Swiss-Prot record:
Gene assigned in the entry: oplah
Family according to the record: Belongs to the oxoprolinase family.
Major subcellular location class: cytoplasm
Protein name: 5-oxoprolinase
Assembly and oligomerization: Homodimer.
Organism field: Dictyostelium discoideum (Social amoeba)
Lineage, broadest ranks: Eukaryota, Amoebozoa, Evosea, Eumycetozoa, Dictyostelia
Length: 1265
């Protein structure tokens, strides 16, 4: 080959993953492409995998040896790379040291986050560690002014302090940071070796001056990397924007170092090579523009671009609106199954983006592809616990890996596929074993499955159930894994109003081909598409990607004719600026195209939709069309607001060469070999094995069959048919109905796990509907709601992760309506209730219940409970601290049909809530709850139609029985581990701040594996509002039991089956009909939980309350609960600044709160030292100070202000809480635990929340017992 032909001819597309680096290189001469795969880390053989891969390919093409450390770039035209370098550094916490600079009072804001805990039943709360090393608080603050009254006050008193932010909002500068102070503070940390800085000030998304000042000084000092939050993503919400700036400061220096080390191994002409990197949004950027916060999805993004541009399946031509025939591509679900997890995404002509995602405990604001991840992959571990097949979320990793890797690993999905004959060891390279020179070990996998099957069969035998073979066990885990992977697919289709069955499944990634047919069958999809390079599609997709500039600015305009010229001018200016950047890089104008977007939402809601500029420029019509499709209704009478203006400018990527393979000769195909494989419908049968490289365009293969390539194994299930497409050689699998094993009503542990996933998936999708369709901050942002499924008698079946106080007591509400209404509950009717005597908790928690009908009979119930911000009562927020009867707490409803014959009964609802201070929000949120229930009904009916009512009912009861078994085993284990007598009684006592006694007499019967919870020693009903209805006690009980069960089981009615509960009437835990109860739900419930967990020795006391703060007047009401410390336990510390036990609501972001309400949050920080000391230390509480800019009624409803949260086993007590008011004259007043006061303008409330108790004497030895 001539030297001229080689010059600038080779395009390299590289996916550097955590384990392997895949390279697809292409050039305009035979053989036109080369694929290379190598380990991402192999320091004994090379220092950088992508560069080594390039070197190897160049050697093969040029036929000569090339130096490893001075690679010749003569033949290289371009290098495109997607990398997990940033992602892995974030997951492993191996980034740069970072200094965080923020506004005074908010040093711990990013640590507290939204104050929720990730797993509601985890007593030993864990979150990933912080990524900044030190914090500087500066005397800096601005106030956003959106309230007319407050604006007029400022104009009268200090008009010169007002400025305009970039959004158009007025800003009052409260304090300008001092230049000398900034410099001295930054120097302290610079001299300690911190060279990367992240800056986030409150409201800097619209007012940039103070961040720019800090950035300027940091640059003067010599900081090497400076991340200013407003320059990265100027969107409202201080926490995610601040975390984004920290992520950028943490990762960008690492990425820059990686790029430097990568390029230094080439010759001096590397600067002439076009090098670009894949960003999280699916667009490429030049190497010098690649930033840490845009790198998180750099790896998987290439695969999404790859399938979006190569999946060529179409539906039949049809008539469009103009009466013409058109061919339309089917929407596609991307299915990328790897070793530890599976990523799913959706494509329907455009890439779907989201602008706020969470990874490794950090919320990141940036345009990212809407990729949903589930912890199920080839390396997911297999467990059998309490009669349940469980897959993951733990992974065996690459080392030691599955059992078959011969490194003393554990059973994983890969082992199951190997045992079933779906993976063939002879087609894997010999890279396993301790010396990485052995093949996959089938015999080791067989032995491990034999041991697991023996364990499972012991359970089967004990429960008079049929014994299982190793094949059945292995396939059972495959089926459970498939169901787990279906859940996120349902969430991105059905939960958003799309029909799953109308999509094509595009499968890629190393493990996906073994599961794709089953996944498609489960979801009713007609086809699977597998690209010829599916195993390296993330690399291949890089060659199809565009260079992209994506930029946006915040906005606060109403979408109307008056503002049209303003936002269109801003949009056009953004387009021109971005376009000019690409022109400056040498792209011709004809290759550049621009997209404009408005981020729109209804006034008073948080659900914004990014609307691409329609052809007719009618953004409003497009927004409403999308909104109605996704949510099923429109909100009338509300302004449309513009939150952000965005542009996305592309420079079209050069297309890769079209792949071509030979056409089929039409002769019968001869398999490479025959392998015994197991399939559910036919058992273990002879299965033909084909090599993809031997197949031609037009070949067809009937299942069962296996197709093998260098990078993937594809299982074609029975009744499916694989077609090799012309001329590309891509694979299309037509999915047949298949013959699944008939599911009977008899307990099958495999189907038990499958139904557990299905029931929980339905509840999850109900929750997604309620988030998207609700109006109020309480429900939409703080997530103070729950959704669940119930049996025909009202027993809890399954719920989505939610608020424990709701879920445990909702079944009492459903049961009450079942008993009260009976046959008077008709189809098309929806019932509302909130009364504590009807299974309610406290009155603001409104429960909406709907029956699921099948052939004219009620067969299930679905219900949703949401906390409404105001329903009347004597104080705004309907949480009066001093209520003496329920009539003072708001509208009390035993049973009200709010939907009859399918029609919302608005007049009746308005009359019921006539004293609400925000009736429109009540109505909107009730409609959201109705919509969530409707979704639940649809999905339940689909499940019944698929399996039959008898089977679905049977597994409903099996799942409840499974939970019962898990609790019984837990009671038995605790009896043994705590050295109790076979029948033994424990007593746990605590007191409310008013002295009311809460006493549990706990009797555990080891032989029966049961317990009696006797509350007879508790105090009498109080003349106040800390009375707790019986549903609250049952809720605290079911939560505590579930929290002490170590395995993953669904929370349901079965948890209470082993428990006899004794609650005498007339007590604080079983009050009279008219007693006040608002505090019982939010305060006494926490004390009940502390008493139960103390009796079991599970952990010390948490902060013991929810710190309920409300404020408002006759025009508005606001409510929040505030985090504190959790109790330590055996071998774990308590957690700081988090919600505990019976609640898990989020806190409203400070910028959202201040924009909507006339307040200033002065401080939100950790209350250091408030946790109890001990062998294991209790978590610390928080300090929260809010200044009011109008006269308001402010109410606090709290506990643990008199009595400290207790330590356990010699651990010390935590600090009690404190509520203060700071008057305008500078005087502080202690307002006690429960009070309602009229606060004057500019006065503040300061809340110090309690910590959690310590566990064990400080110098003692604590064992697991």
């Amino acid at each position: 080959m001539t030297i001229d032909k080689l010059k600038k001819s080779i395009k390299f597309n590289i996916d550097r993953g955590g384990t392997f680096t895949d390279i697809y290189a292409e050039f305009p001469y035979e053989p036109y492409y080369i694929v290379e795969k190598l380990l991402s880390v192999d320091p004994e053989n090379y220092s950088d995998a992508p560069r080594e891969g390039i070197r190897r390919i160049l050697e093969r093409i040029q036929g000569k040896s090339i130096s490893k450390e001075n690679v010749d770039t003569y033949a290289i035209k371009s290098i495109r790379m997607g990398t997990t370098v940033g992602t892995n550094a974030l997951l492993e916490r191996k980034g740069e040291k970072v200094l965080l600079v923020t506004s005074k009072g908010f040093r711990d804001l990013l640590q507290i986050g939204n104050q929720s805990r990730p797993k509601i039943f985890e007593l030993n709360i864990t979150k990933p560690e912080l990524i900044y090393n030190s914090v500087v608080e500066l005397d800096e603050r601005v106030q956003i002014v959106t309230n007319d009254q407050v604006l007029n006050d400022i104009k009268l008193e200090s008009p010169n302090s007002l400025k305009k932010g970039t959004t158009g909002d007025y800003i009052k500068v409260l304090e300008i940071p001092n230049r000398d102070k900034i410099k001295s503070e930054l120097l302290k940390y610079f001299v300690k070796g911190i060279k990367s800085i992240a800056v986030v000030f409150i409201h800097s998304y619209t007012f940039h001056d103070h961040e720019l000042l800090v950035g300027e000084i940091a640059k003067e000092i010599g900081f090497e990397h400076i991340s200013l939050s407003h320059q990265l993503m100027p969107m409202i919400k201080a926490v995610p924007r601040g975390l984004t700036s920290c992520v950028d400061a943490y990762l960008t220096p690492l990425i820059e170092l990686y790029i430097k080390n990568f390029t230094k191994g080439f010759d001096s002409n590397i600067g002439d090579v076009d090098i670009s990197f894949m960003m999280s949004d699916g667009g490429l950027c030049p190497v010098d523009s690649f930033r840490g916060f845009r790198s998180i999805l750099s790896g998987p993004a290439g695969g999404v671009v790859g399938y979006s541009k190569t999946t060529s399946t179409v539906i039949e031509s049809h008539k469009n609106n103009n009466g013409n025939n058109e061919i339309k591509q089917q929407p596609i679900i991307g299915f990328d199954m790897g070793g530890t997890s599976t990523d799913v995404s959706r494509y329907n002509g455009t890439l779907d983006h989201v602008f706020e995602t969470e990874i490794s405990g950090l919320t990141i604001q940036a345009p990212q592809l809407d990729i949903h991840t589930v912890a199920a992959g080839g390396g997911s571990r297999l467990f059998f616990k309490s009669g349940l097949f469980l897959v993951g979320p733990e992974s065996v990793g690459a080392h030691p890996g599955p059992v078959c890797y011969k490194k003393n690993g554990q059973l994983a999905i890969t082992d199951a596929n190997l045992l079933l004959g779906r993976l063939l060891p002879e087609y894997f390279p010999p890279i396993f074993g301790p010396n990485q020179n052995e093949p996959l070990d089938l015999e080791a996998t067989k032995k491990a499955f034999k041991e697991l099957t023996d364990e499972i069969n012991q359970f089967q035998q004990n429960n008079n159930l049929p014994l299982m073979t190793e094949d059945q066990v292995a396939f059972g885990f495959i089926r459970v894994a498939n169901e787990a992977m279906c859940r996120p697919i349902r969430n991105i289709t059905e939960a958003k109003g799309f029909d799953c069955s109308q999509h094509v499944l595009a499968c890629f990634g190393g493990a996906g081909g073994q599961h794709s047919c089953s996944i498609a069958q489960n979801l009713g999809m007609p086809k699977v598409f597998i690209h010829r390079f599916s195993g390296i599609l993330s690399a291949y997709g890089l060659g199809l990607a565009d260079l992209v500039i994506d930029t946006q600015e915040p906005c606060s305009l109403i979408y109307n004719k008056e503002n049209k010229s303003t936002f269109e001018k801003q949009l056009n200016q953004l387009k021109e600026n971005a376009k000019q950047q690409l022109l400056n890089k040498g792209f011709p104008e004809e290759e550049i195209f621009c997209e404009g977007f408005l981020n729109l939402r209804f006034s008073g809601t948080d659900t914004a939709m990014m609307i691409k500029t329609p052809d007719n420029h009618d953004y409003e019509a497009e927004f409403k069309s999308n909104y109605k499709r996704e949510f099923g209704f429109l909100i009338l009478g509300r302004d449309l607001l513009i939150d952000d203006i965005r542009v996305r400018v592309h420079a079209r990527g050069s297309d890769l060469n079209s792949l071509r393979i030979n056409d089929s000769t039409g002769e019968p195909l001869k398999p490479e070999t025959i392998q015994k494989c197991y399939f559910e419908s036919v058992g273990r049968i002879d299965t033909p094995i084909y090599l993809l490289k031997s197949l031609c365009g037009g070949d067809s293969i009937d299942g069962p069959a296996i197709i093998i390539d260098n990078t993937t194994t594809i299982v074609v299930e029975p009744n499916c048919k694989a077609n090799i497409l012309k001329p590309s050689g891509n694979i299309e699998i037509l999915i047949g109905g298949g013959k699944s094993k008939t599911v009977t009503t008899e307990l099958d542990p495999i189907m038990l796990s499958v139904f557990s996933h299905r029931f929980m998936s339905i509840a999850e999708q109900m929750g997604k509907i309620i988030i998207r369709t609700s109006i109020s901050t309480n429900i939409k942002e703080r997530l103070d709601f729950s959704c669940a499924l119930f049996s025909p008698d009202g027993g809890l079946v399954a719920n989505a992760p939610a608020i424990p106080i709701h879920v445990g007591s909702m079944q009492n509400a459903v049961k009450y309506q079942v008993e009260t209404l009976g046959s008077n509950w008709k189809e098309g009717e929806v019932v509302l209730s909130n009364h504590p005597q009807a299974g309610g908790s406290h009155l603001p928690d409104l429960t909406v219940m709907t029956p699921v009908y099948h052939k004219g009979e009620i067969v299930f119930f679905v219900a949703s409970r949401g906390h409404h911000a105001d329903i009347g009562g004597i104080t705004p927020g309907s949480m009066p601290p001093f209520s003496k009867s329920i009539s003072e707490e708001g509208a009390a409803i035993m049973s009200l049909k709010i939907v009859k014959d399918g029609h919302f009964q608005e007049e009746a609802v308005r009359k019921t809530f006539e004293k609400s201070r925000n009736l429109s929000d009540n109505i909107s949120d009730l409609k959201a709850q109705i919509a969530a229930n409707h979704k639940g009904i649809q999905l339940m009916q689909e499940l019944i139609n698929h399996y039959g009512l008898d089977v679905v009912h049977a597994y409903m009861y099996h799942i409840q029985k499974n939970a019962e078994l898990a609790v019984r085993d837990m009671l038995y284990d605790i009896s043994i581990s705590n050295n109790l007598k076979p029948l033994d009684t424990l007593i746990s006592t605590d007191y409310m701040d008013d002295g009311s006694k809460i006493e549990l007499k706990l009797t555990i019967d080891r032989e029966k594996k049961s317990a009696i919870f006797d509350w007879s020693g508790s105090g009498v009903e109080v003349y106040g509002n800390t009375n707790a209805p019986t549903s609250i006690t049952l809720s605290a009980t079911i939560y505590s039991l579930r929290a002490m069960v170590k395995s993953e089981i669904p929370l349901n009615q079965g948890c209470l089956a082993p428990i006899l509960t004794v609650i005498p009437p007339g007590s604080i835990l079983n009050p009279s009909f008219d007693s006040a109860v608002v505090g019982g739900n939010v305060l006494t419930s926490q004390r009940l939980t502390d008493v139960i967990l103390s009796a079991f020795g599970a952990c010390a006391n948490s902060q013991g309350c929810m710190n309920n703060l409300t404020f408002g007047d006759e025009t508005l009401g606001y409510y929040e609960t505030i985090a504190g410390g959790t109790g330590a336990g055996p071998n774990f510390n308590g957690f700081t600044a988090v919600q505990s036990h019976m609640t898990n609501t989020r806190i409203t972001d400070v910028e959202i709160m201040e924009k909507r309400y006339p307040v200033i949050v002065k401080e939100f920080s950790v209350r250091y030292g408030s946790g109890g000391d001990g062998k294991f230390k209790g978590g610390d509480g928080v300090v929260r100070e809010i200044q009011f800019l109008k006269n308001f009624t402010v109410s606090i409803l709290s506990e643990r202000r008199s009595l400290q949260p207790r330590g356990l086993m010699g651990g010390e007590n935590a600090e009690r809480g404190l509520n203060l008011v700071l008057k305008n004259n500078g005087k502080y007043i202690n307002i006690g635990s429960k009070n309602s006061i009229n606060i004057e303008r500019n006065e503040s409330i300061i809340i110090f929340t309690p910590g959690g108790g310590g566990f064990g004497q400080k110098d003692s030895m604590i064992t697991d017992n």
